[in-house]
């Protein structure tokens, strides 16, 4: 998979299927099911390491898990998160991206935030590093803002749209929108030329992403409203992953009950 192909999929209206993976076997079976983008997310802090948030995840953790994923990912585009406090300044962002790309073999790095990270996105883009932005609910900011839908009021919606445009202008090649009203997600998607991947953002983004553990019903505690346990109606993990891919491609997922705003 290439960025060029992902952009062509957006232009053609073909849904992009993204899924998190944290180790080799997960990556292998995701690709076998037809997943086109693998996100090595700092969500591993919660679903793999058992933390309450993503904040304890280190850059070393991210490099380690990205390495494992890439050993068995021979087809999907791989995005790796730059973890909390590894984007304190331009120097730390460049160092973090270099490790994720060189040691982890990631194809792209992801940065959370809007205006705060525009300069960093520009610098990475100028150096030829593919960058994915992340707006809406920002897991790395939960200590301050909590888990809540973003962009429900007109002012915050306008700010998110403006920040999305700023990220694209700075050189972002892709954008994740998390927990924003479906109508706002549609508006942002239509206003950008780069692929927009949604999670809890309705069905009119260019693609969808879910955490693997939610797809397989492995969530500890209450599962997010925007998620679906595909294993409950399947006879194997492989079948569940195939069904997730099929439902995203056909538009069956997400359904109205998975919208959060």
Curated annotation (Swiss-Prot):
Localization: Cytoplasm
Cofactors: Mg(2+)
Enzyme Commission number, as recorded: 2.1.2.11
Keywords: Cytoplasm, Magnesium, Metal-binding, Pantothenate biosynthesis, Transferase
Chemical reaction(s) catalysed: 3-methyl-2-oxobutanoate + (6R)-5,10-methylene-5,6,7,8-tetrahydrofolate + H2O = 2-dehydropantoate + (6S)-5,6,7,8-tetrahydrofolate
Cofactor binding, per record: Binds 1 Mg(2+) ion per subunit.
A Gene Ontology term for the protein's cellular component: cytoplasm
Pfam families to which the protein is assigned, alphabetical: Pantoate_transf
SUPFAM superfamilies: Phosphoenolpyruvate/pyruvate domain (SSF51621)
One term of GO molecular function: magnesium ion binding
InterPro entries, alphabetized: Pantoate_hydroxy_MeTrfase, Pyrv/PenolPyrv_kinase-like_dom, Pyrv_kinase-like_dom_sf
Pathway(s) of this molecule: Cofactor biosynthesis; (R)-pantothenate biosynthesis; (R)-pantoate from 3-methyl-2-oxobutanoate: step 1/2
Assembly: Homodecamer; pentamer of dimers.
Stated family: Belongs to the PanB family.
Role of this protein: Catalyzes the reversible reaction in which hydroxymethyl group from 5,10-methylenetetrahydrofolate is transferred onto alpha-ketoisovalerate to form ketopantoate.
HAMAP family, per database record: PanB
Protein name as catalogued: 3-methyl-2-oxobutanoate hydroxymethyltransferase
Species of the source: Hydrogenovibrio crunogenus (strain DSM 25203 / XCL-2)
UniProt lineage: Bacteria, Pseudomonadati, Pseudomonadota, Gammaproteobacteria, Thiotrichales
């Amino acid at each position: 998979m290439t960025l060029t192909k992902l952009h062509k999929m957006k232009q053609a209206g073909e849904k992009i299927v993204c899924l998190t993976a944290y180790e080799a076997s997960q990556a292998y079976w995701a690709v076998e099911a037809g997943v086109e983008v693998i996100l090595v997310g700092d969500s591993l802090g919660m679903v793999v390491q058992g933390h309450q948030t993503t904040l304890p995840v280190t850059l070393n953790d991210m490099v380690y898990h990205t390495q494992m994923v890439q050993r068995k990912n021979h087809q999907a585009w791989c995005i790796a998160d730059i973890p909390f406090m590894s984007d304190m300044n331009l120097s730390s962002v460049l160092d973090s991206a270099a490790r994720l790309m060189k040691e982890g073999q990631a194809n792209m790095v992801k940065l959370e935030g809007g205006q705060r990270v525009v300069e960093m996105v520009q610098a990475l883009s100028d150096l030829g590093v593919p960058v994915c932005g992340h707006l809406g609910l920002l897991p790395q900011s939960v200590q301050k803002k909590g888990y809540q839908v973003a962009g429900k009021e007109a002012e915050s919606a306008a700010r998110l749209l403006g920040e999305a445009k700023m990220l694209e202008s700075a050189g972002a090649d892709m954008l994740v929108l998390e927990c924003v009203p479906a109508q706002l997600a549609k508006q942002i998607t239509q206003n950008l030329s780069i692929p927009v991947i949604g999670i809890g953002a309705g069905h009119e983004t260019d693609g969808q992403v879910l955490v693997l553990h939610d797809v397989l019903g492995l969530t500890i505690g209450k599962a997010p409203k925007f998620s679906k346990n595909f294993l409950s109606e399947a006879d194997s993990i492989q079948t569940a992953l195939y069904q997730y891919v099929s439902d995203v491609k056909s538009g069956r997922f997400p359904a109205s009950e998975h919208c959060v705003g």
